[in-house]
């Protein structure tokens, strides 16, 4: 595939599997920041056809193992993720949704997250953003959600390697339930922990 750098473009998302390393090298050569995300979430309307493009667990294990061994930045980011997750308490927010961030669409619709566009909490044509932020019942409800509300996650052995995401849960749930866990991401956390522990054990033997 061919990329042309679009003027004023801030972000470009594109799917790759076999040649992602070539894309990374191309980006570095062209002084473009690039990140690798192997997590595909369902569409905001709960359509799951795109999930057929997800990597298998075997493919995930191969890529994560490769990055742990060869990518020092990935290891540093993983360490930061683990440290930050260890600091969290039961009363910690899940993420920035409706406590420090919110999104506005081109039609004026206001929604909690860029991936949650069907969950409209107001419209700036009808109300000010301030009023929506302060008065919206849905914003208030989302703001009350804490880690302790995800009962199963509290006792999970892989929680330090996982970041709970209400959007990916909601999009993948047929009923739009943000508390219905996406098991695919639970298994990603399991793979990350097992491979990281193996990496650390190998370092100690050297």
Regions from the language model: what does each represent?
Residues 117-206:
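Flexible mid-to-C-terminal extensions adjoining Fe-S/redox cofactors in radical SAM and related proteins
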Residues 28-51, 102, 144, 183-205:
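Repeat-unit-sized solenoid/scaffold elements
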Residues 1-97, 103-107, 115-124:
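Radical SAM enzyme [4Fe-4S]-AdoMet core and its adjacent flexible, acidic
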């Amino acid at each position: 595939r061919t990329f042309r750098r679009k003027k004023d473009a801030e972000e470009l998302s594109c799917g790759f599997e076999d040649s992602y390393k070539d894309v990374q090298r191309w980006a570095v050569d062209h002084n473009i920041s690039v990140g690798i995300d192997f997590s595909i979430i369902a569409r905001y309307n709960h359509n799951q056809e795109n999930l057929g493009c997800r990597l298998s667990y075997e493919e995930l294990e191969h890529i994560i193992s490769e990055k742990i061994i060869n990518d020092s930045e990935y290891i540093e980011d993983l360490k930061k993720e683990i440290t930050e997750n260890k600091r969290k308490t039961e009363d910690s927010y899940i993420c920035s949704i409706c406590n420090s961030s919110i999104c506005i669409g081109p039609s004026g619709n206001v929604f909690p997250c860029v991936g949650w566009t069907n969950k409209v909490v107001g419209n700036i044509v009808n109300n000010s953003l301030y009023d929506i932020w302060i008065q919206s019942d849905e914003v208030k409800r989302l703001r009350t959600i804490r880690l302790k509300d995800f009962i199963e996650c509290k006792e999970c052995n892989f929680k330090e390697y996982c970041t709970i995401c209400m959007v990916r849960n909601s999009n993948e749930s047929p009923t739009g339930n943000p508390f219905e866990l996406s098991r695919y991401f639970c298994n990603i956390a399991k793979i990350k922990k097992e491979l990281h522990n193996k990496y650390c054990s190998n370092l100690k033997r050297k």
